[in-house]
Structures are given as C-alpha cells and as structure tokens.
Design a protein with these regions (language model features):
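DNA polymerase processivity clamps
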Residues: 1-158
Length: 158
C-alpha cells in the first residue's frame, strides 16, 4: 500500500524548496475530485504520474492546491473500461539507466512503465489499462491509488 504520509511530505518539501530556489516544483496539488464516489486530492508528479490521496488521509494545506483539474476526473472516467494487466516480473534496463517494468495486456501487448513511478504505490496492487495503453491505472481492491504514463519502447529495443 502506498505510504500517503511519505508522498505528501515529499511533495510539500519539494514545493517549499521550489519557492525558495525559484525553480519549478516536481509536484502539483489540485483541489479535491470525486472518482467512483470517493473524494481524493490529486497530487501530480512531473506531469507523468498522479497520486490520489484519499481526502480522509490528506494532510496537505489547501493553500498549496491549484484550481481543480477537470482532466483528472476525465482521465479516470476512462478507467471504467480498463482491463487488468499481468505483471510479467520482468524489468528492462534502458541504456540511460531507466528501469522499465513490463506488463502484458489480455491481448498479449507489452506495456512498459518506469519502475520509479510505480514503486511508491507499494506491493499487492493491481494495474489496469484501456484503449491504447498509454495510461496505466493503479488500484487497490476498492480504491484507485493513481496512475502513471506508460513508456513507449521501439520493437527493436524489446
């Protein structure tokens, strides 16, 4: 299970540091969204993954939140048609050191996600994709935890 406290602490630390240094923050906090009847505080990391902090576990100051992002709800709306991915237990190492975890769709298509993006979600979770498999949704039994964007790998690199 994701450590909601650690993720929030990392985000606050990064946002505060960015205000001091003037550099762009890696994290963005958005106002609450409701997905499948549950209320979450979306926490976007580098624009390539989103952590959904259940409102009941949120310790984030609403002053840090940007105006709600309707895209978050829209993106998770397409998760309703998502199919479960199978973890192949395979890690592909790219020349630049990035480790990609490989999943398989029910149709045999390989889907790769940067290991660094999904590691904070913890163990014992389920992965889903829909359509063209560009987005990998991450879910516990009852609640969505977030998403990460898939990494495209050329056929000759597989």
């Amino acid at each position: 299970m994701i450590d909601f406290g650690k993720v929030q602490a990392d985000a606050v630390k990064n946002i505060c540091k960015s205000k001091i240094t003037g550099k762009a923050a890696d994290y963005r906090i958005y106002s609450a969204v409701t997905i499948d009847g549950n209320t979450y505080i979306p926490l976007m990391y580098k624009g390539i993954s989103i952590y959904l902090i259940p409102e009941k576990y949120s310790l984030l100051n609403p002053a840090f939140a940007e105006v709600g992002n309707p895209m978050v709800e829209k993106i998770f709306k397409s998760a309703e048609d998502a199919y479960q991915l199978t973890d192949t237990k395979t890690i592909k190492l790219l020349p630049d050191g990035i480790q990609l975890k490989e999943f398989k769709s029910p149709f045999g298509k390989s889907v790769f996600v940067d290991e660094k993006l999904i590691k904070p979600f913890g163990q014992g979770i389920r992965y889903y994709a829909s359509g063209n498999s560009d987005i990998v949704y991450i879910k516990e039994v009852d609640e969505w935890l977030g998403l990460a964007f898939a990494t495209r790998v050329k056929e000759n690199e597989q």
